[in-house]
Amino acid sequence: MKPIADLRSYLEFLESKDMLRRVSVEASPILEIPEILRRIMYRGSGYAVLFEKVKGHEGFRIAGNIFCSLDVVRQALGVERLEVIGERLFEPLKGPPPLGIGGKLRSLGEVLSLGKYMPKAVGRAGFTANVLEGREASFNLIPAFKVWPKDGGRYLTYALVHVRDPVRGVMNMGVYRVMIAGDKEGVVHWQIHKRGMQAQQDSVEKGERRIPAALVIGSDPGTLLTGAMPVPYPIDKHLFAGVVRGEGLPVYRLPNGIHVPANAEIVLEGYIDLEDLREEGPYGDHFGYYDKPSRLFPTFRLERVWHREEPIYYGSVTGKPPLEDVVIGKFAERIFLPAIQTLLPEVVDIDLPPHGVFQGMAFVSIRKRYPGHGKKALLALMGLGQLSLTKIIVVVDHDINVHDVNQVIWAVSSHVDPQRDVLVVPHSHTDELDPATPTPMYGSKLGIDATRKLPEEYGGKQWPEEVAPDPETVRLVEGRWGEYGLD
């Protein structure tokens, strides 16, 4: 299956699945459209919306809730299981090293096959149809959302912020909220643990005052999802987009040297001013609270606006779950499971519960082999990439379905002695957006070992035997069920 070409093709795909509704009456991006999109998701309706008339922005359209269903996302990416996407990168790392010439050639072929996911430079892009610069280039052209009444302004809520890493030269493409602060200024909120902030810090250390940058709005589903993924540094985000898409991403070089997806709807070209640091917020984020950071953030200065004919603006809305970002979080959970299993082979499965707001809570099942294995897994997970920002982690045995919260609750209730099995890690780094920490970015973590205990962990005793029905009686009841007249 060829990857879906762009946002427009993806909307057509959604419409073919009866997952798209069109709104032909005029609607405003200031509070009104965000309220509509939230209401749809809170009702459990689960469909995308295309607003064909946008108040104050003639010629623009707005798409929202485009990631409304994990299964539809899977179909759009053409895979039977979302884990396949992660396996494309990490499966070649598993298994014994090849010894014979045949095995070595196969291994080389697997490595070389990654080349098909590399970005492909092209000389044409649809967004070059319209180029505005000088006085004409303005954030006011863009139908950016004001999501909540007390937000600090209008926000680009799903712009793919492009900056090149100053050390390795790889491309970062992250979803960082951008508060519009003027005609040509936007404040870029990248959190301290993210790759964008790393690029800022490295650039400052090198004595640079600005970073060439681009804000990309609207692309194919695989590329849009990649922007929100916690891709480990220094993997190039354009390369990872190719892995998600199943084919290399076509990219176009802007005058400032930044390569951007050629299928973009809107491109805002400019630079990050590292010396112009400003306040940002408040903004109503995915925890369901207004976030007003205490630190300052760099300013994006707009130089050019590029856009396709009748461009489609895509923006997400945030707030208490479940909203569209829940699907994006579940997508990350699935595609990074193979990576977690490569580093921690004992891991069987993982679940980030929707109301755990991504990094609030995780359930992980493991195949336990020795005393203390549950705590070993907890400590490893607490130090693993973006999972290290997770506040509460519960580890259970391999036979517990982590996607069934009732099974997890049963495991915690029946397997946990709080003094023995609860681990509190104080004075650690935390999610910068967590409203519960007394000091931003610095708090504590909770680990719960809800595995069955081995004798060494249980005072030398054997763990109690679990109840199980008599097999012969089960067969008897199954055979006579119709006689009982119960259903």
Curated annotation (Swiss-Prot):
<dbReference type="GO" id="GO:0005737">
    <property type="term" value="C:cytoplasm"/>
</dbReference>
<protein>
    <recommendedName>
        <fullName>Uncharacterized protein APE_1571.1</fullName>
    </recommendedName>
</protein>
<dbReference type="InterPro" id="IPR049381">
    <property type="entry name" value="UbiD-like_C"/>
</dbReference>
<dbReference type="InterPro" id="IPR048304">
    <property type="entry name" value="UbiD_Rift_dom"/>
</dbReference>
<dbReference type="InterPro" id="IPR049383">
    <property type="entry name" value="UbiD-like_N"/>
</dbReference>
<dbReference type="Pfam" id="PF20695">
    <property type="entry name" value="UbiD_N"/>
</dbReference>
<dbReference type="Pfam" id="PF20696">
    <property type="entry name" value="UbiD_C"/>
</dbReference>
<dbReference type="InterPro" id="IPR002830">
    <property type="entry name" value="UbiD"/>
</dbReference>
<dbReference type="Pfam" id="PF01977">
    <property type="entry name" value="UbiD"/>
</dbReference>
<comment type="similarity">
    <text>Belongs to the UbiD family.</text>
</comment>
<dbReference type="GO" id="GO:0016831">
    <property type="term" value="F:carboxy-lyase activity"/>
</dbReference>
